[in-house]
A protein has these predicted regions:
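Short, Lys/Arg-rich flexible segments
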Residues: 1-96, 102-161
Length: 161
C-alpha cells in the first residue's frame, strides 16, 4: 500500500492570510483608488478615453490642459467599502459629459479668438471624458482588468513566500 503525507502548512498559512486580507479591504480600496487616478492621468496624457481620442479643440495645444487646473484637481478617497475619484472644479462635468453652455447673465458669451473677440449665445462642448467611468458607471476599455489586477495583487499580499 502506498501512503503519502502532505504538509499543507504553507497552503493553510496562505489561505489564512488571504482571508485576513479579504476581511480588511481598506488597503485594497486605497490601491483601487490609486489605480483610478493612474488611469485618469493616462487619459490626460494620451488625450483619450479607453483608446478613443478626444475631439480636437479650437485653440490647438494640449486638450483640457490650458491651465492644468482640471488635471491637478483630481483627487481620490477610499474606505473599507469604497474607492472614489473626482474633482471639485465647477466646469469638470461639462468636459466629462459634454453639453451646451448658454449665456445666462448677459446676452452673449465672449471668447478671445486670435487678436479679437467672438460673441455667441451658446457654445457646444463635446464630451472629453477623462475620468475612467461613464455617466452610467461603465468603466472605460481596459480599466476593469487593471482594477481587477490591483485588487487581486492586494488580496494576495503576504500569501506567497
Amino acid at each position: 500500500m502506498l501512503e503519502i503525507s502532505l504538509d499543507d502548512s504553507d497552503l493553510q498559512r496562505g489561505l489564512g492570510q488571504l482571508l485576513r486580507n479579504a476581511s480588511h479591504p481598506r488597503p485594497m480600496m486605497r490601491a483601487i483608488a490609486a489605480e483610478l487616478l493612474s488611469i485618469t492621468e493616462d487619459n490626460f496624457a494620451h488625450e483619450s478615453w479607453g483608446g478613443r481620442k478626444w475631439p480636437a479643440n479650437a485653440r490647438g495645444g494640449k486638450i483640457l490642459q490650458k491651465s492644468g487646473q482640471l488635471a491637478a484637481s483630481i483627487h481620490t478617497a477610499s474606505g473599507s467599502n469604497f474607492a472614489r475619484i473626482g474633482t471639485n472644479k465647477p466646469y469638470a462635468a461639462i468636459h466629462q459629459f459634454g453639453g451646451t453652455v448658454k449665456a445666462k447673465n448677459k446676452p452673449y458669451l465672449v471668447f478671445k479668438v486670435g487678436d479679437g473677440f467672438r460673441r455667441v449665445k451658446q457654445v457646444k462642448i463635446p464630451a472629453r471624458p477623462y475620468l475612467p467611468m461613464s455617466k452610467g458607471g461603465t468603466l472605460q476599455a481596459g480599466a476593469e482588468s487593471r482594477l481587477l489586477d490591483v485588487a487581486l495583487d492586494t488580496l494576495a499580499r503576504g500569501v506567497r513566500k
